[in-house]
Amino acid sequence: MNNSTSAGVYANGNDNKKFKGDRPPCSPSRVLHLRKIPCDVTEAEVISLGLPFGKVTNLLMLKGKSQAFLEMASEEAAVTMINYYTPVTPHLRSQPVYIQYSNHRELKTDNLPNQARAQAALQAVSAVQSGNLSLPGATSNEGTLLPGQSPVLRIIIENLFYPVTLEVLHQIFSKFGTVLKIITFTKNNQFQALLQYADPVNAQYAKMALDGQNIYNACCTLRIDFSKLTSLNVKYNNDKSRDFTRLDLPTGDGQPSLEPPMAAAFGAPGIMSSPYAGAAGFAPAIAFPQAAGLSVSAVPGALGPLTLTSSAVSGRMAIPGASGIPGNSVLLVTNLNPDFITPHGLFILFGVYGDVHRVKIMFNKKENALVQMADASQAQIAMNHLSGQRLYGKVLRATLSKHQAVQLPREGQEDQGLTKDFSNSPLHRFKKPGSKNFQNIFPPSATLHLSNIPPSVTMDDLKNLFTEAGCSVKAFKFFQKDRKMALIQLGSVEEAIQALIELHNHDLGENHHLRVSFSKSTI
């Protein structure tokens, strides 16, 4: 479309009123003016900017001026869109796009040339919204999106370097519609979730926009498919599952309940009824800093510009205002087996997920302990991965403690060695900035990754070592390209956890100490 076509944009029914270019800020209108759009952008991409906020009813592209006009079905939808994009600059094809209200109250493009593509794109979107057509890129397991597609998404998070809580998922996905229920779990050594929308169309938009995107810079990649389930059955509201329509549900066995402020936020009138909580007038539960970061090229803004500070890159995540990541680094660990557990054992186990500074087993209740991590994010990671795992015949429970630090016993105070300070331990896995250990954080599994193996140690030596520790070895293999590393598969996850506690840092001779961690692979 050449520049002369801008003369054909009319407003308020006055065919003599022509658009003259940029105007000062004006009152809300359902017609939005977009500036600095890429010259090669498609009509569908521009329309996608408005999809999360409501129906797009008209579009006019002024490619020669790198501008466009987008008409929403209602002024309310346009206001929601402007409110969202004011602090979060949208991007098209990696280029920032600027949006403001137009002086026009509606777009009249009937008699304009070169509008066929825009109208075709609008008709396609309208068909999707009415359930009669599939969106490009939104497919089911069979490869096509059928009418009546499930409102439930299956989400897998790869490269889980930093904690992704249920609240973080709610914050991200609620940009595309009302999230009714979320269930999180670990399967095939991967953190996964099932998320149910109120409307299948919202699930389609979310999948289009978020599949393949990173939650944080260069990590926590979202892989999204439609679930075969059409509804989720949530029995408990806790840190692993949530029914946002039933805040009266119990928390379940030993699970932390929803904090009152969080429950009030998710259950407040107007939030569940609004599909875009956080976009207009609602301060989201997780307030990510509005700074340079990630963008979504198609339907933007869901992830927001999440930014990790330099401390986060070294494994100490700092997201100012992120109430979804509590600021406490001390965990309360309960339901331990007092006959077997020691401060050193807890240090080794929790040290898989962060640097443990102090451990205190309760003097009068030895099945309980406090574990102080280096920071809140490491505490969250450890809690997410270890709570619910079996250890020495009992199901370990980990929650955030009310204590801000583990106090060392006073001089002369009876302690029986139940409190230990590990803050200067050489066994910390994450003390080096940029350590590869940040890339190898996986849930407990029956397969262990072994490293730092000296050349003289054979497969039989290692199998015997684990057998003598009470494990049943199911399989073993050295890495083909690096014989210093191996995988060993044991009889159960519980066996593997106990073997890791006992054999990590085991002296193999020749100044080599065995390094043990959980593997994402199987043999």
UniProtKB/Swiss-Prot annotation:
Q: Please give the Gene3D superfamilies that the UniProt record associates with this protein.
A: 3.30.70.330
InterPro entries, per the entry: HnRNP-L/PTB, Nucleotide-bd_a/b_plait_sf, PTBP1-like_RRM2, RBD_domain_sf, ROD1_RRM1, RRM_dom
Residues bearing the modification Phosphoserine: S425
Q: Which residues carry this modification: N6-acetyllysine?
A: K394
Supply the Pfam families for this chain: RRM_1, RRM_5, RRM_8
Residues with the Phosphotyrosine modification: Y98
- Enumerate the Gene Ontology biological process terms: erythrocyte maturation; mRNA processing; negative regulation of mRNA splicing, via spliceosome; negative regulation of RNA splicing; regulation of cell differentiation; regulation of RNA splicing; RNA splicing
Q: Name one GO molecular function term.
A: mRNA binding
User: Which tissues is it found in, per the record?
Assistant: Detected specifically in spleen, thymus, lungs, and bone marrow.
State a GO cellular component annotated for this protein: nucleus
Question: Which positions bear Phosphothreonine?
Answer: T109
Residue(s) of cross-link: Glycyl lysine isopeptide (Lys-Gly) (interchain with G-Cter in SUMO2):
K36, K187
Q: Which residues form the RRM domain?
A: 30-114, 153-229, 329-403, 446-521
Query: What keyword terms does UniProt attach to this protein?
Result: Acetylation, Differentiation, Erythrocyte maturation, Isopeptide bond, mRNA processing, mRNA splicing, Phosphoprotein, Repeat, Repressor, RNA-binding, Ubl conjugation
User: Briefly, what is this protein's role?
Assistant: RNA-binding protein that mediates pre-mRNA alternative splicing regulation. Plays a role in the regulation of cell proliferation, differentiation and migration. Positive regulator of EPO-dependent erythropoiesis. Participates in cell differentiation regulation by repressing tissue-specific exons. Promotes Fas exon 6 skipping. Binds RNA, preferentially to both poly(G) and poly(U).
Assembly description: Interacts with THBS4 (via the acidic amphipathic C-terminus).
> What name does UniProt use for this protein?
Polypyrimidine tract-binding protein 3
